[in-house]
């Protein structure tokens, strides 16, 4: 479930890669260069912050070997420092509030799980020590370490995911969905992407339990460039 965090951060990194300006490929094989050169961007270098009203972070894992159980996080944030001239200098950071997990449980949880002491399945997942243990570990974080272009709109993003006090590298596949020179409601450039990835819960110290070990995460978001506030007007003479 924590994998969400990784996904959210990594996804951001992937976006950077997918939408950064093409680098000088002189001397490189023509076919390979053409197949991975990123599309031209309208967005410019700078810091891009996630638009929380246009973002989602979901995770799923095998359940009873017959289906995939899916839930989401409602509170998370991400920031991309985009350098279109040098992709290696671009950075992505993300944080997730594990207490915001939303299982959308439709049954009578209290009536069927009275012994747990939790008021809902979402609270159980968030606070139970065998799951997200949000009281002891109130944040899941991700910081990118590498972005590798794989196509004109795709990239692999690797970063450090810290979950349950354990930090491990996670790699995600990201897709650049498009960008705007000027957002229709905000006077600034905007960019969007999707990302997916997988990791094992046991790698972060979570017991296997009755559900699957491998977690799949899916992240979709729009990012808007930070604009410096206008300088105050000079006082009248």
Task: Give each language-model segment a name.
Residues 1-23:
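Gram-negative bacterial Sec-dependent N-terminal signal peptides
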Residues 19-237:
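Low-complexity, acidic/polar, glycine-enriched regions of mature
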């Amino acid at each position: 479930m924590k994998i969400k965090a990784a996904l959210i951060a990594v996804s951001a990194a992937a976006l950077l890669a997918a939408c950064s300006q093409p680098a000088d490929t002189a001397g490189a094989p023509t076919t390979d260069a053409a197949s991975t050169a990123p599309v031209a961007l309208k967005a410019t270098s700078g810091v891009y912050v996630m638009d929380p009203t246009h973002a989602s972070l979901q995770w799923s894992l095998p359940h009873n070997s017959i289906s995939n159980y899916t839930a989401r996080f409602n509170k998370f944030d991400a920031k991309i420092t985009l350098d279109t001239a040098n992709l290696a200098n671009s950075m992505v950071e993300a944080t997730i509030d594990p207490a915001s997990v939303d299982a959308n449980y439709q049954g009578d949880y209290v009536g069927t799980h009275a012994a747990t002491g939790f008021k809902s399945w979402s609270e159980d997942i968030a606070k139970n020590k065998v799951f997200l243990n949000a009281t002891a570990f109130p944040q899941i974080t991700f910081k990118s370490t590498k972005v590798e272009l794989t196509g004109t709109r795709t990239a692999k993003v690797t970063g450090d995911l810290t979950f349950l006090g354990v930090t491990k590298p996670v790699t995600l596949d990201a897709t650049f969905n498009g960008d705007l020179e000027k957002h229709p409601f905000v006077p600034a450039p905007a960019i969007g992407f999707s990302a997916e990835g997988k990791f094992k819960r046991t790698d972060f110290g979570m017991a296997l339990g009755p559900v699957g070990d491998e977690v799949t995460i899916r992240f979709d978001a729009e990012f808007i460039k930070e604009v410096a506030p206008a300088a105050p007007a000079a006082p009248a003479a």
